[in-house]
Every structure is written in C-alpha cells, then in structure tokens.
Design a protein with these regions (language model features):
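Auxiliary Fe-S-binding modules of radical SAM enzymes
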Residues: 1-76, 84, 226-234, 242-287
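Short linear Ser/Thr-Pro motifs
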Residues: 59-61, 94-95, 108, 174, ...
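Short beta-strand motif preference
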Residues: 68, 80, 91-93, 196
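A generic beta-sheet turn/junction motif
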Residues: 73, 84-86, 177, 189
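Residue-level structural signal for beta-strand termini and adjacent loop
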Residues: 82-83, 150
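Canonical Radical SAM [4Fe-4S] cluster-binding loop centered on the CxxxCxxC motif
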Residues: 84-120, 128
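Cys/His-clustered metal-coordination modules, chiefly Zn-binding fingers
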Residues: 124
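Conserved AdoMet/S-adenosylmethionine-binding subsite of the radical SAM
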Residues: 131-135, 140-286
Length: 287
C-alpha cells in the first residue's frame, strides 16, 4: 500500500520546474535517456530561461562581495550573497521570503514571514549565479529548519551525482536551533556542516535577542547541537554576536566555557555595529 503522503511526480511537473527534482525522480518518470539529457542541460550547460522559475532582478557589487536579488514567479524577491575567499567562493542562500524568527539584529524578518521557498528556488540560487561556488551556506533570508523538508530536498538535489554533484562537506546550515528539527537532522545521513546561531548564554537574554524562540530551552538546544557533532564526528560552529551591555559579560564567557570546553566546536565571535539596537541595550557609539 502506498503512503498517503506520497506525491506522484508527473512529466508535466518536471517540465514546469525541473530544478526541483533529483535524477532518480526524473528518471523514474521520463526514462534514463531523457533524464540524462535534462540533467546535463540543467547543470552542465549555461542556464536556460525555459527551465527557470526565477530570474536575476539586480546585482550589487561590493569588493569581494556580490549580492543578487532574485525575482520569483509570484513577484516576491529574495537575496543571495556571494563572497570571494582565498580558497574559492561561498554562496549564502535564502530559504524563505521574510522570516518568522525576529532576531533583533536582522532585517530579514522586518516584514514578517511570507512563505517558504521551494527546493527548486533554493537550488536555482546556486545554479543561476555567474560565479562557480565551492561552498554553500544556508543563512540568507529565513530560518532553514522552519522550512526543513524543502531545505533537505534541495541538499539532495545539489549533491546528486548526476547533476551538480556538490560535495557534502561544502554545505553548511545555520540555524537558531528549533529542537524537533535538530533531532531530525541528527538522524539524516547527510553529514553536512552545522552552525548554531546562539547569541546568548541564558534563557532570558536569548528571549530578548531571538524573541520568537521563547519556547525553546537554550540548554536543550546546546545539548542537541553537541549530540549532532558527536554522532557525525563533525565540528560545529557556534555563532555569537557580541551586543554591548547585553551578552558580553564575564558570566557569558564562563558559561560558553562550561558548555563547549574540550568539545568539537568552533566559537565564532561576531562584532555588531551598535546603532540599530542601541535603544534596546542602552548603548550608543559614545559609550
């Protein structure tokens, strides 16, 4: 008996949005010959408009950084950022239009959450670029784990050996750490890199910085991330934005040490440009 949640993929669906499917899904539907031809056209040749469900709306250049604005079929736009490094190019992809999380330092959620991006819309942020990238980071607009199924599907498509064949160790998901999804990613056989946007060492402070994560226990989030690291033998990154007067005290340093000392963890301390949250913290550039 077929699972009630099973989606029957048709040739019409593939023709209308081919970037949303793996080689196996396409092959099962249209046969090996057509599947190989289509995958070659999608991932080995110059991008063709007839296969695209989005387009480059604008490009902003700034030194080693290039920001793309992509216009989606429904008229909404998302941003994708390319960063040149000594060892290649990193692309930072979006997973949502808007964001439901509401981090006080981030503009992505200023207009609230509008919708999730499809697997195809995530994949096209990589394939339509002018740059050839060797690292993909899921940390643009949106919280990747609140669009879990589409994000995981996009990774399977990007890793497909018959397509882009992107290496797993070149993929990183940055998340604020919803517990259910952290448990799910632990059981996936993807072995991707993981970054936890922590930004606090106690519940009260994290609830201020990430107000829409109030229902998630900070200690359990840390435990889950460390469990992922141990299970997959992967170094995880802890992103910690230093906000003067809010999360930069000696007690914060000590708590970070208690959690992560002798663990397979990289703590990435980030400096914030104060003005936008000066009112919240009582800090100004003159302090």
């Amino acid at each position: 008996m077929k699972n009630k949640n099973t989606i029957i993929i048709t040739e019409e669906m593939i023709n209308s949005d081919p970037y949303g499917y793996t080689y196996k899904e396409i092959c099962d539907c249209v046969g090996e010959k057509k599947a190989r031809s289509l995958m070659h056209a999608l991932y080995k040749e110059k991008p063709q408009k007839k296969y695209q469900t989005m387009s480059i709306n604008d490009i902003y250049n700034g030194g080693d950084t290039r920001k793309y604005s992509f216009k989606l079929k429904d008229g909404y736009c998302v941003e994708t950022v390319c960063i040149k490094r000594k060892t290649g190019v990193t692309v930072c992809v979006s997973t949502m239009v808007g964001c439901p999380v509401g981090c006080i330092f981030c503009a992505s959620g200023s207009n609230g959450f509008i919708r999730n991006l499809t697997p195809s819309e995530i994949v096209q942020q990589v394939t339509l670029l002018k740059e050839k990238v060797n690292r993909i980071v899921y940390m643009g607009m949106g919280e990747p784990f609140f669009n879990y199924d589409n994000v995981i599907k996009s990774i399977h498509i990007l890793r497909d050996r018959n397509g882009l064949n992107f290496p797993t160790d070149g993929i990183n998901i940055s998340t604020v750490g919803p517990l259910e999804q952290l448990k799910k990613i632990r059981e996936e056989h993807l072995k991707i890199q993981l970054t936890l946007s922590l930004h606090a060492t106690n519940q009260r402070t994290r609830d201020i910085i990430i107000p829409h994560m109030k229902g998630y226990d900070i200690n359990k989030i840390v435990e889950s991330v460390l469990s992922y690291s141990e299970r997959h033998n992967r170094k995880v990154t802890i992103a910690y934005l230093l906000i003067p007067g809010l999360n930069d005290k000696a007690t914060d340093v000590r708590q970070l040490g208690r959690w992560f000392r002798e663990k397979n963890v990289l703590i990435n301390l980030l400096q914030y440009n104060v003005p936008q949250i000066a009112i919240l913290t009582g800090q100004t550039n003159n302090n």
